[in-house]
Amino acid sequence: MTATIDYLTSLFTRFNDDYFDGKLPLPHLRLSRAKTRLGTFSCRKKKTWRGWRIDNPTISISTYYDMTERQIQNVMLHEMIHYAIALSGVKDTSAHGVVFRGMMDNLNRKYGWEISIRQNTREWETTSKPKVRQRLILAMRLKPNRCFLTVVSPKHYSQLNSRLSLVP
């Protein structure tokens, strides 16, 4: 299954009502193609006259792997725990510290979820084959028996091409 923004929105709304008493404002929801992170939660902390508040909360879910519906749900809940901790202002011992693990264990034990901190994705199928990208390789002879090879960034190709046309 490949997640969509609409699906993530419905998951967030349902889980917020069911497990977080509806206290989490809807964050920005994004899809990513990350290979090493199935999900991320990010926000900025802003100081106000009342104290600290979080700004621009964002939950991203990777679509790189072909995850089951249950796996996507577990990833969403994992990120929502991070969001709830950030919103509450509670200081945890680390990103996956005592508070996080307590909330995760509670959801797993009480409701039968399989939320985890790490997931081995080595055997997982990807949603699509990686795109083959063309690259421009620049080769220059510096001195006899000395060469310089480099891959040219696509954004610098036109600039490099115009400068090389000036070389006699």
Regions found by a protein language model. Name each.
Residues N74-L87:
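Active-site recognition of the HExxH zinc-binding catalytic motif
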Residues M1-R70, L87-P168:
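Metalloprotease/metallohydrolase-associated module, dominated by Zn2+-dependent proteases
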